[in-house]
C-alpha cells in the first residue's frame, strides 16, 4: 500500500539524516518526529525542536527521556519563526507538521507568515542534499491559507538549486494532508 503522508515523511528523513547531523523539528507536537530525528542523528548529532505550547514540550521531553534520546535534543519553547536566532547551520533535515496540536487546543494553529519566515531561515542553512519536509493539514480554519502559502513558496524555488516534491492522495475525502519536500541539490552536480 502507498504510505500515508506521515509515513512517507519519515522515509524521506531516513534517506538523508546520518549520525552526527543537525536536524530541526519545527513543530514538535507530541514528539514523534523529534524522537525519530534524535535516533537518526545519534549522540553525536543535534536536534532543535520548536513548539509554542508547554504541553508539547512536556510530552516530548517525557518521550525522549524514556528512549534515552534527550541528550541530543534542544527543546525550544518558541515558535519556529525564531529559528534563525537559535540554529546557526548547516541543517541536514527539517520537518513541519502544519495545523494544530493533535488532542490540543484547535484555536492554536501554525500560521502562513511564521511558517514562511522559518522556511526562509532554513533555506539559508540547508546543507547540500538536505531536505525540508512539510506535512500540511488544512481541514481547519486557517489551514487553506497556510497550504496556499507553502505551495506558492515551494513552487517559486529555482529548479537549478532545489528539487521540490508534492505528495498527496487526490481521491480521498476530508482534506488528507499534503506533503511537500524541498531538497537542496548538490552544489557540484548543479554546476554541470
Region roles according to the model:
Residues 125-136:
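Conserved beta-strand signature within the Rossmann-like core of class I S-adenosyl-L-methionine
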Residues 46-51:
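Conserved SAM-binding motif I beta-strand of class I
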Residues 18, 41-42, 126-128:
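Helix-to-beta-strand junctions that scaffold the AdoMet/dcAdoMet cofactor pocket
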Residues 96-118:
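Mobile active-site "lid"/loop adjacent to the S-adenosyl-L-methionine
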Residues 1-21, 35, 39, 57-88, 92:
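S-adenosyl-L-methionine
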Residues 29-31:
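Conserved glycine-rich SAM-binding loop
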Residues 143-192:
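Class I S-adenosyl-L-methionine
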Amino acid at each position: 500500500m502507498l504510505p500515508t503522508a506521515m509515513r512517507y515523511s519519515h522515509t524521506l528523513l531516513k534517506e538523508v539524516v546520518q549520525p552526527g547531523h543537525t536536524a530541526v523539528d519545527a513543530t514538535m507536537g507530541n514528539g514523534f518526529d523529534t524522537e525519530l530525528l534524535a535516533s537518526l542523528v545519534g549522540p553525536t548529532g543535534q536536534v532543535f525542536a520548536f513548539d509554542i505550547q508547554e504541553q508539547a514540550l512536556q510530552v516530548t521531553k517525557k518521550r525522549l527521556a524514556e528512549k534515552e534520546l534527550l541528550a541530543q535534543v534542544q527543546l525550544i519553547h518558541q515558535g519556529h519563526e525564531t529559528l534563525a536566532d537559535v540554529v546557526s547551520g548547516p541543517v541536514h533535515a527539517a520537518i513541519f507538521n502544519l495545523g494544530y496540536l493533535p488532542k490540543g487546543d484547535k484555536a492554536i494553529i501554525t500560521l502562513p507568515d511564521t511558517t514562511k519566515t522559518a522556511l526562509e531561515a532554513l533555506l539559508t542553512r540547508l546543507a547540500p542534499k538536505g531536505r525540508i519536509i512539510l506535512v500540511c493539514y488544512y481541514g481547519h480554519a486557517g489551514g487553506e491559507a497556510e497550504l496556499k502559502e507553502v505551495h506558492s513558496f515551494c513552487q517559486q524555488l529555482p529548479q537549478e538549486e532545489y528539487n521540490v516534491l508534492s505528495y498527496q492522495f487526490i481521491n480521498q475525502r476530508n482534506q488528507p494532508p499534503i506533503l511537500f519536500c524541498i531538497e537542496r541539490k548538490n552544489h557540484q552536480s548543479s554546476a554541470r
